[in-house]
A protein has these predicted regions:
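Aromatic-rich carbohydrate-recognition surfaces in CAZymes
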Residues: 314-334, 389-428, 469-477
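A compositional/structural signature marking long, glycine- and acidic/polar-rich segments
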Residues: 425-532
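Short sequence/structural elements of tandem HEAT/ARM alpha-solenoid repeats
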Residues: 344-348, 418-423, 494
Length: 644
């Protein structure tokens, strides 16, 4: 990530940051799986997969969610199964990293009683006492067959590390300062000897995690190392492998499974969990040069019509950025078709608009089309908020459109790239700072273990954080890659390619193309999940109950990179059949919200599907063309895919 300086922007907090249970010196961890534990009047449950965790009046409680499936939802809420009371009055987060968070439990005077470490990908929860104390348990643990365990919520939990400290009929732990206790739930279908193996590995509880990634032509690699304190390097602990991580190496699995809201998870031992995802190539131009003359003529006429009908762009960061990206796509078509009378003024207009947004002092002079630096929450925020962007919601969606437009328009214009860089680099750092620092957290929105981003800034929800439009997240990283290329930053481009490919894999694994035969989600009645939370997945959106919205929000904005959504043609058709108002063959069926986006998605099922969609697109009602799209781009997409 290039050096950035937030102080070049006006300093302003557009909305107050909620109460934060955070030690001084830590950058506020917005957009994290654990943000609800940090922000707000009271700590909310969080979901360090596969566990669920909540702070309680005297300490904490945790459990393994019992996944329940309905027609509309896959539910895995926080239900306390094991509780630990140490007389705590409050909690405060003292550290966080790639996949772990550590919180101190404090007494009424603010003194530390002990610390809990929560780790994504680990079923082991560890508590370390900071004083001599007795921890009261809500269930009685006892030794059976060489293991100390208890039944809770229909599940057996194993206690590791402090079995000899049990007292009070197994409901108390007498801990000395520095003593640790760890618990894990026994997996389903654990073979003989597996629980003993897991207990031995759980004796090496995780103290922190680190991230490494690699980018190759055909795949990207994500590797999370689970550090175990003073243990020798490489000591294995218990890890959990989710469906998107199946192409993994370095883990010993076959130790049982857990049902999670994301599907069946494999229980393994490893010191590093590494997996690959198919590489997705960044793309900023839909290549129409190979189209026939008739198609080019039709397209040229439509480009002229759309260019002449452009209206002033909105001034907020979502719709304003989306309009810039839309017009960048129109510019790319006009230039390929040799329409200089359209392309030259449109390029000038886009360059001027981008320069206006990128004026560092813009918000000192106007109330729109500019950015400020919020020094309290450490974020760059658009002066005209939308969808809660002043509360850190959806920044990657919004800023991805700006980065995309800048990457396209400045691709062959170094002077423009240089003018935009001070502010565009800040937008990039806000959502994707690689290392983190005093100004921004590392990878603010992206969860490396989950393989996808989180959209809510403060996550004030009992079901954890969430993300709806996984496709806009993918598009954001595509935009980041294009901007990195245009600004000559090879390191940032490599990081963006990793983010792009990883998010695309998880988007398919949990939003659009998940395994419908996975027994963990048996009974779910839909082909997509349009809202993925820490503790559930829903066939629902924030804005509409229309079936077309459920799929449309998972495919827009259908940028040139959207080919990652292709795969099984029958799955694409099944997803569409659920979303449309009638048979795919009937043009009226596409007269729905996001009808244009669904037509473009249909083209990914094959050339015949694209040709059929093209016929319908020509007469699709104008109000069904999304505000981030034009009929020109819609037709061009379908023409290109029909000719493939």
């Amino acid at each position: 990530m290039p050096d950035v300086d937030p102080s070049i922007l006006p300093q302003e907090s557009l909305a107050p940051m909620p109460t934060a249970r955070l030690v001084d010196g830590l950058v506020p961890p917005t957009n994290r799986w654990f943000s609800g534990l940090v922000f707000g009047a009271e700590p909310l449950p969080v979901f360090p997969v596969p566990l669920a965790f909540g702070a309680t009046a005297g300490g904490f409680a945790f459990g393994l969610p019992d996944v329940q499936v309905t027609e509309q939802s896959i539910l895995g809420p926080f239900v306390p199964q094991v509780g630990v009371d140490v007389g705590a009055s409050s909690v405060v987060v003292t550290a966080y990293d790639t996949a772990s968070v550590t919180l101190d439990l404090l007494d009424g005077a603010g003194s530390v009683l002990g610390a809990v470490t929560l780790v994504e990908g680990s079923p082991v929860l560890r508590y370390t006492a900071a004083t001599d104390q007795t921890a009261e348990l809500t269930v009685a643990f006892a030794e059976t067959g060489g293991l100390v365990s208890a039944e809770a919520g229909g599940r057996e939990f194993v206690l590791v590390g402090s079995g000899d400290a049990l007292s009070g009929g197994g409901r108390s732990l007498d801990l000395a300062e520095g003593d640790s206790a760890a618990w894990f739930p026994v997996p389903d279908d654990a073979p003989d000897g597996a629980v003993a193996t897991l207990a031995e590995a759980a004796a090496h509880p995780v103290t922190g995690t680190t991230l490494a990634y690699g980018v190759a032509d055909d795949a990207v690699t994500t590797a999370i190392t689970y550090e175990t304190g003073d243990d020798p390097s490489g000591a294995a602990t218990v890890v959990v492998r989710l469906p998107h991580q199946r192409e993994s190496e370095g883990a010993t699995c076959g130790l049982g499974t857990y049902a999670t809201v994301r599907g069946t998870a494999d229980v393994c031992t490893a010191s590093t969990l590494a997996w690959t995802s198919p590489a997705v190539e960044p793309a900023g131009k839909l290549d129409v040069t190979a189209l026939g003359e008739d198609e080019k003529t039709e397209l040229a006429d439509q480009v002229r019509a759309d260019a002449s009908a452009l209206e002033p762009r909105p001034s907020d960061t979502y719709f304003g950025g989306k309009a810039l990206a839309r017009d960048a796509n129109l510019l790319a078509l006009a230039e390929q078709l040799g329409l200089d009378d359209v392309a030259v003024p449109l390029r000038d207009d886009l360059a001027a608009a981008l320069r206006e947004w990128a004026e560092p002092s813009g918000c000192a002079e106007r109330d729109a089309r500019c950015f400020v630096d919020d020094p309290e929450v450490r974020s760059v925020v658009g002066r005209t908020p939308s969808f809660g962007s002043d509360e850190l919601n959806d920044h990657h969606f919004h800023y991805g459109y700006f980065l995309y437009a800048a990457g396209v328009v400045a691709a062959d214009d170094p002077a423009l790239a240089a003018d935009l860089a001070p502010v565009l680099d800040l937008l990039a750092a806000d959502v994707a700072s690689g290392a983190g620092g005093e100004d921004f957290p590392a990878l603010r929105v992206f969860d490396a273990y989950a393989g996808h981003s989180w959209a809510s800034g403060y996550a004030p929800f009992a079901d954890g954080n969430n993300q709806e439009s996984a496709s806009e997240a993918v598009s954001a990283w595509n935009g980041l890659a294009l901007w990195a290329r245009a600004s000559g930053d090879a390191t940032l481009e490599a990081q963006a390619r990793w983010l792009l490919s990883a998010e695309a894999a998880s988007a398919r694994a949990y939003w659009t193309d998940f395994d419908r035969e996975d027994p963990a989600i048996e009974g779910f009645g839909h082909t997509v999940t349009s809202l993925v939370w820490g503790g559930k997945r829903d066939w629902a959106t924030w804005f509409s109950a229309e079936p077309s919205a459920m799929l449309g929000i998972l495919v827009l904005p259908m940028q040139p990179v959207a080919g990652y959504l292709a795969g099984d043609p029958e799955r694409i058709r099944a997803n569409l059949d659920e979303a449309l108002a009638g048979p795919r063959e009937d043009p009226a069926s596409w007269d729905v919200m996001f009808g244009d986006q669904l037509l473009m998605y249909a083209a990914l099922a094959g050339p015949d599907d694209a040709a059929a969609a093209l016929k319908i697109a020509r007469s699709l009602p104008a109000e069904r063309i999304d505000d981030g799209n034009t009929r020109s781009y819609l037709l061009a997409w379908l023409q290109v895919h029909a000719a493939a």
